[in-house]
Amino acid sequence: FEYWDAQVDDSRLVVLNAQQAAEHGADVRTYTECVALEEGKGHWIVTLREASSGIEQVVHAKAVVNAAGPWVARLLEKLFAKKPPLDTRLVKGSHIVVPRLHCGDQAFMLQHTDGRVIFVIPYLDDYSLIGTTEAEFDGVLETVHIDEDEIAYLIEVANGYFKRQLSRDDVISTYSGVRPLIDEEGKDATKVSRDYHLEPHKSAVPLLSIYGGKVTTYRTLAEDVMKALAPTFPKMGAPWTKQAPLPGGNYSAQFGGKNGELQSGRDAKASAEDEATLSALLSAQAPWLQVSLLKRWLQTYGTETQTLLGDASSASDLGMHLGADLYSREVDYLIAHEWARNPDDILWRRTKLGYLIDERGKAVLADYITTVRAAAAKGAG
């Protein structure tokens, strides 16, 4: 049988939501930890610590949302020095990336011998993404990684269906994530609910902790959080995110929409046509730009590609070549607009160029970022 589903780059989705929040006045702090939370008169006294400098700052908040994911219960225990009201059950899922197993843009849903379903999904242009596993996790969250038995498990199911047989040497990359589910004693990990739960803290000032949830429901989850906090913010407006494109996705504003809102009835075909229109416009504006680079920029940044391209009038305006098709102009953009601070931010969290850039390129990129950040710090001082 055949059905339709959606695919998203989760790390870029997070960044784009942060960008949209900043556009609406949010103060976005990356690499910043909440180290203390004290209840004051009508507000929380929040102590924040910046990771690289260790500098602490105290801010006041009318409400706090604990959206720490798998750290949700640990954070509560750390801040209040007592066991949180709900326990979390951590379930790890891992994926492997291998050379492309099949042609076409369809994904495959395979059933393993244990009855579990595994997906094989076209990934970037040259790879297949295989996953996910599912297992209880009691390790160190900061160093979560795939186990060899998980790799063997995923290879086994793929080899049971595809003519091209995989070996351990075919695994190009791996990644693992941990779901913070509510602990339902006695239930197998595969049976525990994936639904989200909002748990209010017993305090006069609102503190809401989020348990569970998944990327497909993140927006409605956020709306439910805001609904719960509405009494604290009486001037809060009506929900608006359903019809609001994320940064880079406002094609309808340029090609027939109004007020930056999505046009009702616009489908994937219309969006693809809009992207093709913008691609043609930018190709005419910058005929010197490599077709493959423009394609990647459009897929990654959408309409923000125009901001990235800016007033560049030749290939030399792209700046230093840092490996693959990464130039310093893009790195500067990511530092200025997407809070990138280190090579992993650039190569894995904002793009997926980590698959293409060699160790020398990574070292050159690290040196460049260090130089840019040092110059920025000197200028700020």
What residues fall within each predicted segment?
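Flavin (primarily FAD) binding-site architecture
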Residues: 66-81
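C-terminal amphipathic alpha-helical interaction region
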Residues: 355-360, 364, 374-381
